[in-house]
Amino acid sequence: PDHVSCVYIRQGEPLGLGHAILQAKTVIGDDSFAVVLADDLIDSKKGVLKQMAEQYVDINSSIVSVQKIEKKDSIHYGMIDTDPSDGNMRKLTGIVEKPSPADSPSNFGVVGRYIFSNQILSFLETIGFGAGNEIQLTDAIKKMIATQPVFAYEFEGARYDCGDKLGYIKANIEYALKDKKFGRELLSYLKEKAL
């Protein structure tokens, strides 16, 4: 859209997601901002970022997107703890980076979409290096939770982990099946291979 401008900033060295966000500090300034991790592809009627932005307007607090995952997979995610709620929006009470299944506070994992107030930057600047000798976004979120509300949003849509080879293949198949030109032919091929 005409009213949107994109700026790309390279992270000079792989020092974690928190470090990557800090590279954009001068561009972010005093604004709220979104973080989108490209390896999390989410297929939904209404874009997840749009869903989250609508929530942000209502609550004016930082939001992380979450999805129910199998506890055995908690070692791959930031796992959250929240106030009890029946809705898709929950107030965070804790977050742990890649815990063992036994130590996971819930079955909700954080997945690749965030909207933050610029205050997250001050937490990122002061937390130092965490797990993997990286600046961990989850550590900054944990500090933020102690001073202001942060919410978890269980989005509507199907997520594909394109950082995983099988997840990448599944995403390509799902999107190809929806394609008007190739979908039917691909479905016939897959059925033939399944027999």
Protein language model annotation of sequence segments:
Residues 11, 67, 82, 97-98, ...:
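Active-site donor-binding loop signature of nucleotide-sugar glycosyltransferases
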Residues 34, 54-57, 86-188:
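Catalytic-core segments of class I nucleotidyltransferases/pyrophosphorylases
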Residues 190-192:
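N-terminus-biased detector of the onset of the functional/mature region
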Residues 22-26, 77-82, 110-111, 166-170:
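Short, surface-exposed amphipathic charged segments that create phosphate/polyanion-binding patches used
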Residues 1-79, 125-127:
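Conserved beta-loop-beta/alpha segment of the NTase-like Rossmann-fold superfamily
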